[in-house]
């Protein structure tokens, strides 16, 4: 039970589907409180609703910006950030501009992240690199840029692309960053075995929409 609680405290309980209903969001919030997940991660439109439910529970409120493509203006991402903070978000998962990164416009990527970090005023910033679209060398470069730009986490994927997390990807990221940087594994994580394996090789946080199933598996073992 104790180990299960420790693992629950590393999970961002997530529902980012465009067709998510209010009833589903309410259940997500209730489950997060029950299992003591680290946070709930929802689209910005749900922040106020979720915040009212989880207030005082110890569950953090996470949202996404520039999601899921990352291909919006920095000014748009900053606007989304400000509105998300206004509505209670304490953790922000932002998508980097994948196309610019592929074109090796690393300075633009870095400057955007720095602006987001500065405007976040100490709130947790996780930068999504969409590992399924990157080769090993690109994952290494992206990881270093994100750390140097002051973000708190490198996040593997949106869950809306062609690949999620793997232990191999976590190892690549881990070998590219210092011990001060953290990693969030996300995308296709649906079993307790996956969670345990990802944590073992260096993931600090898990993003999953199957968190309740994962916890039930852990508690049954």
Describe each region flagged by the PLM.
Residues 1-30, 115, 163, 172-182, ...:
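Alpha/beta catalytic cores of nucleotide-metabolism and tRNA/nucleoside-modifying enzymes
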Residues 29, 33-49, 67-69, 92-110, ...:
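Glycine-rich, proline-tolerant flexible connector loops at the mouths of alpha/beta enzymes
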Residues 51, 72-83, 134-145, 168-175, ...:
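Catalytic cores of alpha/beta
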Residues 63-68, 86-101, 148-163, 185-195, ...:
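Glycine-rich phosphate-binding active-site loops on the catalytic face of alpha/beta enzymes
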């Amino acid at each position: 039970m104790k180990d299960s609680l420790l693992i629950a405290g590393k999970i961002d309980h997530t529902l980012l589907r465009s067709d998510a209903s209010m009833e589903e969001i309410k259940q997500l919030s209730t489950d997060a409180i029950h299992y003591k997940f680290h946070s709930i991660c929802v689209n910005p439109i749900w922040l106020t609703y979720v915040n009212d439910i989880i207030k005082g529970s110890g569950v953090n409120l996470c949202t996404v910006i520039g999601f899921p493509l990352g291909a919006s203006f920095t000014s748009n991402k900053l606007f989304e950030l400000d509105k998300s903070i206004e509505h209670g978000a304490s953790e922000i998962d932002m998508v980097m501009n994948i196309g610019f990164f592929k074109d090796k416009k690393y300075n633009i990527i870095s400057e955007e992240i720095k602006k987001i970090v500065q405007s976040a005023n100490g709130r947790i910033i996780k930068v999504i690199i969409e590992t399924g679209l990157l080769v090993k060398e690109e994952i290494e470069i992206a990881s270093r840029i994100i750390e140097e730009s002051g973000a708190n986490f490198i996040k593997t994927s949106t869950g809306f692309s062609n690949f999620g997390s793997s232990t191999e990807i976590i190892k690549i990221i881990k070998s590219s960053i210092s011990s001060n940087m953290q990693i969030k594994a996300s995308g296709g994580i649906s079993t307790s075995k996956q969670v345990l394996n990802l944590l073992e090789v260096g993931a600090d946080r898990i993003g999953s929409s199957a968190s309740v199933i994962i916890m039930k598996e852990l508690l049954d073992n």
